[in-house]
């Protein structure tokens, strides 16, 4: 098992678990909330078959990584990613983020530049800025964010159950595009996450990424499902595509937020076409 040390909390090292497979151009896959590198299994297989080197890692607080009570913000998440880049001496890299992982992609480029990044991919994006403000009147009100965080604190396991119902649009896709066993596996990974990170990672979703978008200067792919109930497309990717008109923008009709699994074939085709 491979780890990169990204800091310390008191007497304990903070270590991120990662996997590094295959050969060719490196593709770094960054998972969403309460998920880990295994959430990319359908994409990992397709990317390896196409001759790529595929690197996944678990965000601090999740998966097999350390569970600190510090650093649950995008400046730190981007610094963690930079530590992985440094350890593996990554260059000419394709950065691919899903959901919460799109924040690392945006903030990494915004903070560290694109010298080591060849292309960027945003799937189910949080960008540009989801929180309601004078400039974003259609955003999510702070009181709704606070209510969500309170629900996680009260019973995160019950929250995960309702979260995945909308993550996969189970009323539409259970038994056809996703099995009960796959949903259960997602829940089990979520349940293994840090109780602290389970609360504070979602607070970071409402980071303002508009300044980071201004610094994206590499070929970029933005993908989003029109059926996304967790991260509404009108508030995020459609606005993101307007803010970054040079990007390739793809909407996947009817796809839920958890489309890496439910619409894996469509995601893989778009991803491989973009990487070609």
Please place each PLM-identified region on the residue numbering.
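Conserved HGGG/HGGXW glycine-rich cap/lid loop of the alpha/beta-hydrolase fold
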Residues: 9-70
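Conserved alpha/beta-hydrolase catalytic His-Asp/Glu region
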Residues: 128-139, 150-214
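Catalytic active-site module of serine/aspartate enzymes centered on a nucleophile-bearing elbow/loop
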Residues: 246-276
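Acidic beta-to-alpha connecting loop that harbors the catalytic carboxylate
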Residues: 226-229, 254-256
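Conserved alpha/beta-hydrolase "acid-adjacent" motif
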Residues: 229-235
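Flexible "cap/lid" loop of the alpha/beta hydrolase fold
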Residues: 106-111, 115-154
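Short beta-strand/loop motif that positions the catalytic acidic residue
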Residues: 216, 222-224, 228
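Active-site loop/oxyanion-hole signature of alpha/beta-hydrolase fold enzymes
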Residues: 7-11, 49, 55-100, 109-111, ...
């Amino acid at each position: 098992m491979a780890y990169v040390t990204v800091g310390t909390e008191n007497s304990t090292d903070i270590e991120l678990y990662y996997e590094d497979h295959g050969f060719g151009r490196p593709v770094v896959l960054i998972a969403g909330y309460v998920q880990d590198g295994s959430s990319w299994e359908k994409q990992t297989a397709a990317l390896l078959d196409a001759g790529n080197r595929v690197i996944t890692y678990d965000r601090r607080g999740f998966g097999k990584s350390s569970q600190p009570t510090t650093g649950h913000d995008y400046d730190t998440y981007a610094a963690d990613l930079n530590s992985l880049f440094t350890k593996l001496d990554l260059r000419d890299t394709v950065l691919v983020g899903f959901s919460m992982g799109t924040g690392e992609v945006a903030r990494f480029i915004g903070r560290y530049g694109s010298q080591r990044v060849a292309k960027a991919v945003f799937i189910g994006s949080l960008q540009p800025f989801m929180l309601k403000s004078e400039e974003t009147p259609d955003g999510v009100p702070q009181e709704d964010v606070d209510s969500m965080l309170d629900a996680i604190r009260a019973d995160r396991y019950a929250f995960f159950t309702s979260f995945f119902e909308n993550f996969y649009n189970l009323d539409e896709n259970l038994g056809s595009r996703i099995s009960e066993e796959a949903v259960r596996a997602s829940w089990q990974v979520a349940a293994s996450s840090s109780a602290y990170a389970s609360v504070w990672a979602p607070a970071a979703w409402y980071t303002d990424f508009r300044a980071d978008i201004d610094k994206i200067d590499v070929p970029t792919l933005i993908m989003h499902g029109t059926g996304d109930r967790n991260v509404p497309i009108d508030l995020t990717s459609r606005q993101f595509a307007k803010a970054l008109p040079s990007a390739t923008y793809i909407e996947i009709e009817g796809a839920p937020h958890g489309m890496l699994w439910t619409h894996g074939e469509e995601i893989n085709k778009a991803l491989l076409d973009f990487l070609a």
